[in-house]
Amino acid sequence: MIRTVDGRRIGYDDSGGTGTPIVLLHGFPLDRTVWDEQAGALAGRRVVRVDLRGCGESEPSDGPALMELLAGDVAALLDQLGIERAAVVGHSIGGYVTLAFFRMFAERVAGLALIASHVAADAAGGAAAGASVTQRTLAAGRDALALDLERTGTMEPAIASYLPRYLAPAFYAERPELVERLRAVMACQDARGCAQLIRGMQVRVGGEDLLADVRVPALVVAGAQDTYLDPKTLRAVANAMGAVYVRLENVGHLPMFEAPRATGDALAAFAQRVG
């Protein structure tokens, strides 16, 4: 489905159903189809899956895709769908958007879930005072990737950078058909739009100050073999906001692909708590 939201095309799916709506926000550089395997676990619920700018069927951003802009897109789409309040679930960058949505529209959040997503800022692209050498190095790499995406006009630079690291080693080696499926999802995204998503992530505001304000059902899912995030850090995030913490063994940065049933079960239990 496609709607025009504030003059911009936004891709989404709306399952219909009962209960508090569940909004699913995908990671980078992916789209709303990454949640396909969780549809069964959430059957009967109203589930809205959204494509972020530059991904799937959504138009790319004209400038840096700030998390606040993306959260505003979600809010405007929910307005059009007649949804006043929803539980928001975000994977990776989708988690950043989830936190931005909570900061901007806390009264509309009935539940909050972070899937392989952290809350700390990226030190303003590594240029902020106090940024570590590691942060600066990572930021420089992301800056270069954004430029490569714009220069080539293809997703190949992002695929080469992210695909091998997103999955647990055993999964990457033993499930070639799913690796190719993931590659295909990445390949069909808008390269220039994804460059703007990178720039938006670089300057995002951290969400540590929000955690104590979470008074709704919350969930944090971590992959034990995630090379981007330390599960211990995500456990601390869960503790800080009183969330249920689910650690998935032999899983990397993509629980929806690597452990679809366990991820679906976690989301179903979360949805039940939301009501």
Predicted regions and their residues:
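Flexible "cap/lid" loop of the alpha/beta hydrolase fold
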Residues: L99, R103-M104, R108-G153
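Conserved loop-alpha-helix segment in the C-terminal half of the alpha/beta-hydrolase fold
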Residues: D213-V251, F257
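Post-His helix in hydrolase/transferase enzymes
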Residues: F257-A271
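Conserved HGGG/HGGXW glycine-rich cap/lid loop of the alpha/beta-hydrolase fold
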Residues: R8-G63
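Residue in the alpha/beta-hydrolase core beta-strand immediately N-terminal to the catalytic nucleophile
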Residues: D51, A87, A110-A113
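Gly/Ala-rich beta-loop-alpha elbow adjacent to hydrolase catalytic centers
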Residues: G90, G94, T98
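Conserved acidic catalytic loop of the alpha/beta-hydrolase fold
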Residues: L69-A86
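Conserved alpha/beta-hydrolase catalytic His-Asp/Glu region
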Residues: A124-L138, T152-D213
